[in-house]
Amino acid sequence: MVFFPELEQARLLRRYKRFLADIELANGEQLTIHCPNTGSMLNCMREGGQVWFSRSNDPKRKLPGTWEISETPQGRLACVNTGRANALVEEALRAGTILELAGFELLKREVAYGEERSRIDFYLEFADGRPAYVEVKSVTLGFPDTPVAAFPDAVTQRGAKHLRELAALARQGIRAVQLYCVNLTGIEAVRPAEEIDAAYAQALRAAVAEGVEVLAYGTRLDARGIVIDRPLPVLLNP
């Protein structure tokens, strides 16, 4: 995924009302931009830290830009725009980068499924007619002195619901995959954030016991673009 034009750099003044952020450009100009992240953004932003944002040329937009990347307190880079994860995964799927899911012949987005009326991020179908349901989560939570990232960064009942739906598919013999897109530099593994959401961690382990596949992929990212580039281990019982 290439950012065009290249992202602009600024200094974060504050994030507020969840979806708003005030930033200051190098020339002293201050802007209010959109924050496309509903999570707590724990450990992936700091007031006064560096951020990178994209500008919009749409005159109908109320805000001139979107916050894309943040410098974390640990000096890493995090893609805080959670909407990028699905686009990155689709790009990687079509390129064959995610080897565990290579060789599909059909890809559909946002397909309805399950008893709890969920929508799967990606429905894949292979040459022999076998389907695979793939749920994507964006990971940006890192910690000092460890290369292990964690998910989620806030309690997520929705995330636990998705795991239950995937587990129900697996019980029927249908391939179900939870894929973590790690949009954070300097990471070597992923784990459930049990200290933040124990119910989610338990749901993840239960889903794996039912046959759900859990994958994680890391990214390279900077102001020019982001690309999924390597598989990462998932530590279910760190």
From Swiss-Prot:
It comes from the Bacteria. InterPro entries: SfsA, SfsA_C, SfsA_N. It holds the Pfam family SfsA_N. GO terms for molecular function: DNA binding. HAMAP family: SfsA. NCBIfam families: sfsA (TIGR00230). Belongs to the SfsA family. This is Sugar fermentation stimulation protein homolog. It comes from Pseudomonas entomophila (strain L48). The gene is sfsA.
